[in-house]
Structures are given as C-alpha cells and as structure tokens.
Design a protein with these regions (language model features):
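Small-residue-rich hydrophobic transmembrane alpha-helices
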Residues: 53-113, 152-171, 287-347, 351-353, ...
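Helix-terminus/linker motif at the lipid-water interface of multi-pass membrane proteins
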Residues: 29, 33-54, 123-132, 188-194, ...
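Transmembrane alpha-helix boundary and packing residues in multipass membrane permease domains
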Residues: 24, 28, 40, 79, ...
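Short alpha-helical transmembrane segments in multi-pass integral membrane proteins
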Residues: 1-21, 81-148, 192-247, 315-383, ...
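Small-residue hotspots at the loop-to-helix junctions and early N-terminal turns
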Residues: 50-61, 138, 142, 201, ...
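Residue-level signal for short hydrophobic patches within transmembrane helices
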Residues: 14-33, 37, 62-69, 147, ...
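Short runs within selected transmembrane alpha-helices of multi-pass transporters and secretion channels
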Residues: 27, 145-163, 171-179, 200-213, ...
C-alpha cells in the first residue's frame, strides 16, 4: 500500500494519467459497446431495420437508469477510497467497499422488479408508441435486458472500486471480456438463430454475467482495501459520504435519461406533424436516427468521462495529501486532452456523417432516413468541443470533493438546459428544434463552467483548498 501511495504522490502526472485513464477509457468504451453493438447488428438485420433501431433507442435510456445508480455507488466509493487512502484511513476505505457491494446488489434487484412489473407503461413513457412495430420490438428487448440488470449494475459499480484498489488493468479486462462475448454472440443469435431483439438482448446479458463474475473473483483477492466479513453491511455514515461523492455521476446520467425521454417524445410528437414522417412506414425514422447520433455521442463521451474518471484516484489521493500543485497540473492536461477529443469528434460528425450512418445499416433504408441522419449529425453535435470540456469539469469538481458545485453544474446542463430546450425549441422549429437543443445547452453550460474552471485554478493556487 505504501508503494502505491508513493506512486500516486510522486510519479509524473502525465504518466499517472496514462496508467489510470487509458484502462478506464477502454472499460467505458467497451461498456458502451454493449448497446451500440446491439444496435449495429439490429440495424443490419433486414427483418428488423429501423423499427429495431427505434426500439433500441426507446430502451437505451432505461439501461442508463441502471448505470446511473451503479456509477453513483462505484464512483462515490472510488473517490472515497482514494481520499481515505491519502489520509491513511485504510479501515474506512474497506468499510466503504463492503457497503458498495451491498448497495449495488440491493438496488439492482429493486430496479429489476420495477422494470418487469411496469414494463409497458415505462416503454410508452419513453416514446415507444411511435408505431405498433416499434412498441412490439421494444417490449421483447426490454424484457430480457431487465433480467440482466443485477449483473450489469454489479459489474459497473465494482469497476471503479477495482481501479481504486490499484488495478485499473483488471477493471478494463473484466469489462472487455463481457463485451467481446456479446460481440461474438450477437451475429450468431440475430442472423443465424433468427432470434431478433431477444437474441440481441440475451447476448448482452450473457456478456454482463461474465463481467459480474470477474468482479466477484477480484473482490475475493483485493490488494489494498479488501473488506472483511463484517464490512459487508450498510455503514450509514460512510454510505452518506460515499453517495454524496457519487451523486454527480448519478445526476449526470439520470438527467440524461430525462433529456432522452423528452427528446424521444418530442420526436414522436413533431414527427407526426411532418409531411414525410407522419406516414406510418416512416414514423420511426426520427427516433431511430437520433438514437444513432446518440450512440456516436456515447462513444465520444465514454472517452471523455473515462479520461476524467480514471484520474479520480490520482486527484483524490493528492488532494488528501495536500499536493495541490500536482492536482492543478493534472487539471490543465485533462482539459487540453478533452478539448482535443472533442475536436476530433467534431471533424468526424461534420465531415463524414454518411460514413458514420452506413455503419448502422443505412443501405437498407430510404433516402428520407439518410437525409435526416446527415442533418442530425451535423446539427446535434456541432458543439462537441464544449460538450467534452463541460463533462471534464463536472467530474474533476467531483474528484476534488466539490460535490455540490459539480452536481449543480451537471443538473443545469442536463435538466434546466437539456430538457428545457428539448421541450421549448420544437415549438418554434419543429423537428429541427430537437436537434438544436443540445448545442444550445452546451454553449450556455460552458459559460457557467468557464467561471468554475477559473475559480478552481485560483483555489489550487492558494493554501487551504478543502476536500469533502
């Protein structure tokens, strides 16, 4: 443990970023691939096509709800463990890991029960009634995905805990193993077995079981913060502090769910008013297309969040040890890297939308599908650089213990701006208004985030910056 602590406090910041961020990026990218790979194979199955794509778009926010709870537990535990180790409080760190395990299992079982009981109402709430085919496919996909929620949540919650224990490589491998299995099984179940949406969902769940099993294996062999038998219970005071640190991750994800629900319903409502998309055979196109755009955005944000979240143990330890100069250096490099990622994503979205669309089976679709998809990529993602910097700011504030500031900024972006503009702008611009909602939200959020960035730099240049 001492060697690990010394490494976090003395090694070059750039090297630490590579060691911790790269595995985290890969883990999140691979985790994102579960749903993205499903959508790619679904779209390229001629008997599913855009109806299956639209159904996947309907169900996707519901998996994000599970992810939101899992990352609140996992990221909160990760930050708490890192700060505790920086202060030399190993016992507290171990108790928090035990609490995280219990919380993730209990919450996943409750969520699964709710999903199975209220499935039809939930699907309708997220825009699944756009037409009969989409609703039917969404029902089938959602049922099997719900059965895998406990495994998915446990694996996602334990991933950052494993990183905090000092083994980001195993965290990456556990996620990668499940995703690879999913990629192998998807074409077999969808194309060979002709299982359709059920096949895509079953492949996903089997991959999630593998990831969860590897997480259990690691928990039994943890290096630094292995909990004892008495630690596997809910320690009230620790849970409160841990969840406070993870609340930003939760709100960031759950508010995205609210935004997606608003967007899906606005696409359904204003698509029904459009000359083309009001026709039954084209009604699912806006939802299917925006779902594809969101998958590309998810890939980019997985890189951005992975880069920032991977640095949480480094930031937490150095803040706990009072080494603010190192934290400031890391923040500077992080913002620069995130801006570069955003710039690359912007070039792809603006310059090569047709090629991106082709990955999701556009060859089987009408020209209306392709034309709307090109417009969606170029409009919805035109402020990717600011979106990436904003995300980095949210997570960094969380890492240094400023949970309230991070939470408020995240809520303003996703709920006040994201949901607000998704509901407001279509009233004036129709379907195009849905596409305008994201860039407008990112510009206004950056205005606020810029002030917080300046304030954070000032505090890191002075003595007495606080943690927790």
């Amino acid at each position: 443990m001492e060697n690990t602590n010394q490494f976090l406090g003395t090694e070059r910041v750039g090297k630490l970023m590579r060691r911790y961020a790269v595995p985290c990026i890969i883990s999140l990218l691979v985790g994102a691939l579960y749903n993205i790979v499903d959508q790619i194979f679904i779209a390229n199955a001629s008997y599913l096509g855009s109806y299956g794509n639209a159904a996947n778009t309907v169900v996707f926010p519901l998996t994000v709800v599970a992810l939101a709870i899992a990352v609140m537990i996992g990221d909160g535990c990760c930050a708490f463990v890192s700060i505790s180790l920086g202060k030399g409080e190993v016992g507290e760190a171990r108790k928090s890991v035990g609490s995280a395990v219990v919380l993730s299992v209990a919450s996943s079982l409750v969520l699964t029960a709710l999903y199975l009981i209220f499935a039809d109402a939930i699907i309708s709430m997220f825009g699944g009634t756009v037409n009969e085919e989409t609703f039917h496919y969404a029902q089938e996909y959602f049922f099997y995905i719900s059965l895998g929620i406990p495994f998915y949540m446990f694996g996602q919650a334990m991933n950052p805990v494993i990183r905090a224990d000092g083994d980001p490589r195993f965290a990456m491998i556990s996620t990668l193993a499940g995703a690879v299995l999913n990629i192998i099984l998807d074409p077999i179940f969808i194309f060979e077995c002709k299982w359709g949406m059920m096949g895509a969902a079953v492949a996903t769940v089997l991959g999630q079981i593998v990831t969860a099993a590897l997480a259990v294996w690691y928990l039994c062999r943890m290096k630094t913060v292995k909990p004892g038998k008495g630690d596997f219970r809910l320690h009230a005071s620790l849970c409160t502090r841990m969840l406070t640190l993870g609340i930003t991750s939760f709100l960031s994800q759950i508010s995205l769910v609210a935004a997606m629900a608003a967007i899906n319903n606005m696409l359904r409502k204003y698509g029904a008013m459009d000359e083309i998309f009001s026709q039954e055979q084209y009604a699912q196109i806006p939802m299917a297309v925006v779902g594809i755009v969101m998958k590309f955005f998810q890939i980019v944000i997985s890189i951005v969040v992975g880069m920032a979240a991977g640095c949480i143990p480094v930031v937490g330890y150095n803040m706990g040890a009072g080494k603010k100069t190192r934290v400031r250096e890391l923040f500077t490099k992080l913002l620069l890297c995130e801006a570069i990622v955003g710039a690359v994503a912007l070039i792809l979205a603006e310059g090569f939308p047709r090629q991106l669309i082709a990955v999701f089976g556009a060859a089987n679709e009408s020209s209306y599908y392709t034309d709307f998809a090109i417009k969606a990529f170029r409009t919805y993602l035109c402020m990717m650089v600011l979106a990436c910097v904003n995300k980095a700011c949210f997570i960094f504030l969380q890492a240094v213990g400023k949970a309230f500031s991070s939470t408020m900024l995240s809520m303003v972006r996703e709920v006040v701006f994201g949901v607000g503009f998704a509901l407001l702008l279509p009233r004036f611009f129709g379907l195009d208004g849905v596409l305008y909602s994201m860039p407008v939200s990112d510009v206004l959020t950056f205005v606020i985030a810029a002030g917080m960035i300046v304030k954070t730099y000032w505090e890191l240049n002075t003595e007495g910056a606080t943690v927790l």
